[in-house]
C-alpha cells in the first residue's frame, strides 16, 4: 500500500476492496469491516488531505454460474450479503469523512441480480459491465477536474 497509494499522495482516492472477503462460510462482517477500517485509518493517518471515496460492492448473478465451484461460492456471496457489506462500508465513510459511491444502479436486472450480459460467470464483469459504472462516475470525475482548474 505504501508504494501503490501512500507514496503517490493522491488528491483523490477511490477504494473498491474486500469483495473476496465475502466468499465462504467463514465470512464475518465485523472482521471484514475491521480490516477495511484498518486500511482507511492508515490512509487517513498518512494522507489526511486526500479526498477518499469508498465504493459499494458490485452485485452478482448466481443464475449464470456453470462451474460447480462457483455455484458453491454463490451460496455465500449473495446480493444480500453484498448489500450488508456495502452498508458497513457506507458507515465507515461517515466515521472517516469519506464519501460513499454506489455506482451500480445500472448493473441490476429486474430480479435484482447483476445483468447476465455484464458478467463472465456471475461475479466478475466483462469490459461492457464497467461502462455503466464509468458512466455513473464520470460526472464526479469531471467535477474534480473542474475544481482543480483542469489539472489532472
Give the positions of each predicted feature.
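N-terminal cationic-hydrophobic initiation segments that often serve targeting/anchoring roles
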Residues: 5, 40-45, 90-93, 145
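Loop/turn elements at helix/coil->beta-strand transitions in domains of secreted/extracellular proteins
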Residues: 8-13, 47-52, 96-99
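Oxyanion-hole/transition-state-stabilizing segment in secreted/luminal serine hydrolases
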Residues: 1-33, 59-61
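Active-site cleft segment of glycoside hydrolase catalytic domains centered on the general acid/base Glu
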Residues: 26-35, 73-76, 120
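Generic structural signal for well-ordered alpha-helices
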Residues: 36-41, 86
Amino acid at each position: 500500500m505504501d508504494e501503490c497509494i501512500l507514496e503517490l499522495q493522491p488528491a483523490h482516492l477511490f477504494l473498491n476492496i474486500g469483495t473476496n472477503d465475502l466468499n465462504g462460510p467463514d465470512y464475518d462482517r465485523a472482521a471484514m469491516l475491521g480490516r477495511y477500517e484498518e486500511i482507511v485509518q492508515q490512509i487517513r493517518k498518512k494522507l489526511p488531505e486526500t479526498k477518499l471515496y469508498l465504493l459499494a460492492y458490485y452485485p452478482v448473478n448466481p443464475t449464470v454460474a456453470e462451474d460447480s465451484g462457483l455455484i458453491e461460492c454463490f451460496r455465500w456471496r449473495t446480493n444480500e450479503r453484498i448489500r450488508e457489506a456495502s452498508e458497513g462500508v457506507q458507515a465507515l465513510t461517515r466515521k472517516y469523512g469519506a464519501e460513499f459511491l454506489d455506482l451500480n444502479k445500472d448493473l441490476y436486472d429486474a430480479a435484482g441480480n447483476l445483468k447476465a450480459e455484464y458478467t463472465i460467470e456471475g461475479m466478475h464483469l466483462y469490459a461492457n459491465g464497467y461502462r455503466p459504472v464509468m458512466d455513473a462516475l464520470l460526472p464526479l470525475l469531471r467535477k474534480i477536474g473542474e475544481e482543480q482548474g483542469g489539472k489532472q
